Amino acid sequence: MDADSGNTLAGARGAATRLPAQDLERARRFYSEKLGLEPVDERPGGLLYRCGQSEFALFLSTGASPGTFTQMGWTVDDVDAVVAELGRRGVVFEEVDLPGFRTRDGIAEIEGNYPSKGARGERGAWFRDSEGNMLGIGQPVV
């Protein structure tokens, strides 16, 4: 426990991301063909991926339902370029039109998101993987 903040996780070395998959082979194809990612480790019922300094795992789950909010996301330098490239690979981005939150060509401009990181906002885009998990891409606007 960090005595200064009272936060028991302040000293953690990272967070684990685990996404459910009802069909691991279908998920493997999606992450390979659409996102260009290959597993770095494979165990019965699970695949481990590495992206830069981060890792995430897909696990075989027959009961978990996909999320309606972002379950995992990546920070990128150029959200437009990433959206364009993934679109060419067949990724379909969510279109949202809600009061105060709207995407245009799959990308939302979010004012005031993540000010603690020195950003005045974020440009973000969301899509679902082959298992229905909501994934996001974000570019801080400084």
Task: Describe these PLM feature segments.
Residues 11-12, 18-56, 61-63, 81, ...:
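Core segments of cupin and vicinal oxygen chelate
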Residues 5-6, 26, 33-37, 111-115:
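Intrinsically disordered, low-complexity segments enriched in polar/charged residues with Gly/Pro
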Residues 15, 44-45, 70, 123:
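Residue-level marker for the onset of beta-strands and adjacent loop->beta junctions
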